[in-house]
UniProtKB/Swiss-Prot annotation:
One GO CC term on file: extracellular region
Function: Probable non-functional open reading frame (ORF) of V region of the variable domain of immunoglobulin light chains. Non-functional ORF generally cannot participate in the synthesis of a productive immunoglobulin chain due to altered V-(D)-J or switch recombination and/or splicing site (at mRNA level) and/or conserved amino acid change (protein level). Immunoglobulins, also known as antibodies, are membrane-bound or secreted glycoproteins produced by B lymphocytes.
Protein name: Probable non-functional immunoglobulin kappa variable 2D-24
Stored SMART domains: IGv (SM00406)
Pfam families in alphabetical order: V-set
Framework-3, as annotated region: 82-113
Residue ranges, annotated region (Complementarity-determining-1): 44-59
GO biological process: adaptive immune response; immune response
Chain spans, region Framework-1: 21-43
Amino acid sequence: MRLLAQLLGLLMLWVPGSSGDIVMTQTPLSSPVTLGQPASISFRSSQSLVHSDGNTYLSWLQQRPGQPPRLLIYKVSNRFSGVPDRFSGSGAGTDFTLKISRVEAEDVGVYYCTQATQFP
């Protein structure tokens, strides 16, 4: 019998108030996955996330049920201390992806993508 885990992606966006605001659209919003198999979540930004200093301040966070969010990936592809190597981040400009090479039961939760290029 195949075991399924539910990974939840969450749409994270700044409510547009002017043409300069960055809108981030994450897909899929919810994704059933099979334990031991790969999974990915992608998002697209309405404009480039490359900061004026040349860095891209894009992070991925994971929130397990009943726990606060924890940082997984920062600056697109850097794993935070203690994050398993099955998690990886990639992308550039406006398109970014979080990949899990082999889903484990402890990976169930809500995943957020955040940017620090522009604030509302």
